[in-house]
Swiss-Prot record:
Pfam entry (one): HOK_GEF
Name the UniProt record assigns to this protein: Protein PndA
Organism: Escherichia coli
Function (record text): When overexpressed kill the cells from the inside by interfering with a vital function in the cell membrane.
Localisation per UniProt entry: Cell inner membrane
Length: 50
């Protein structure tokens, strides 16, 4: 029974992570912080290889 509980917990965590990534998929490649006159921007650059 504990193995089944662990498996269900793992499935719930994975589904939650997938839903979160799906909701914020457009903003995963950039990060922006503004504080007063200072702006910090970090951008992830990647290329798809085929």
């Amino acid at each position: 029974m504990p193995q089944r509980t662990f498996l269900m917990m793992l499935i719930v965590v994975c589904v939650t992570i997938l839903c979160f990534v799906w909701m914020v998929r457009d903003s995963l490649c950039g990060f922006r912080i503004e504080q007063g006159n200072t702006v910090l921007v970090a951008t992830l650059a990647y290329e798809v290889k085929r």
